[in-house]
A protein has these predicted regions:
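Bacterial N-terminal signal peptides
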Residues: 10-19
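Glycan-recognition and processing domains
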Residues: 24-59, 74-77, 105-115, 151-170
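Noncatalytic modules at the cell exterior or secretory-pathway interfaces
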Residues: 66, 126-138
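Short acidic/polar inter-strand loop motif in beta-rich domains
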Residues: 75-77, 139-146
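Short coil-to-beta strand junction motifs in C2/discoidin
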Residues: 78-86
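Short strand-turn-strand beta-turns centered on an Asx-Gly dipeptide
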Residues: 89-95
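Beta-sandwich interaction modules
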Residues: 113-127
Length: 170
């Protein structure tokens, strides 16, 4: 057998072993998650939840890294950048998230075909061990609700030669 065959098998095995370690899962709201928006992004269906007046509440077990992926709906004719924002309540602490992105033309909505959506605004939070409550609240000076999805990724285990750095907040 040639070395090319062995090399391609080795690359495949390494790729799948890395993919299994970096598994991410979509989090579903535990409260007020009945309303959903299905967006088609690169021929894949992605589930987003609008942040309405009641907010969205999630219960998450740590340690994990939470990714907040948000988009803002815009009518089809608009092309400029659009600012949108929301608030995160994490175990009683408040974080205000502000984004400003251009409209991405390739995204379509099943429920709202006359809307386009901005590029995604991503925000990350690392959670320590334990159970955490995350509440997402709207900021009311916006015309449309912000659409959001939360993805949870587990941390890889620390080896003896790695050091965990903690940021200092003043």
């Amino acid at each position: 057998m040639s070395q090319i065959v062995y090399y391609s098998k080795l690359v495949t095995i390494v790729f799948f072993s890395l993919a299994l370690q970096l598994e991410a899962r979509l989090l579903k709201p535990t409260k007020n998650g009945e309303e959903k928006e299905v967006l088609i992004i690169n021929d894949k269906r992605r589930l987003y939840y609008p942040i309405r007046d009641g907010g969205l509440e999630y219960s998450v077990k740590g340690p994990s890294r939470i990714e907040f992926i948000s988009r803002y709906p815009v009518l089809k004719g608009k092309k400029k950048s659009h600012a949108f924002k929301y608030r995160i309540l994490l175990d009683g602490d408040t974080i205000s998230v502000n984004h400003k992105y251009k409209v991405q033309r390739t995204i379509k909505s099943v429920q709202h075909p006359r809307h386009k959506y901005t590029y995604s605004g991503n925000y990350f939070i690392n959670l320590q061990e334990g159970t955490h409550t995350i509440t997402l609240l709207p900021i009311n000076d916006q015309k449309y609700p912000v659409l959001i999805r939360l993805i949870s990724k587990e941390f890889e285990s620390l080896r003896k030669d790695k050091i965990f750095l903690k940021p200092m907040i003043h």
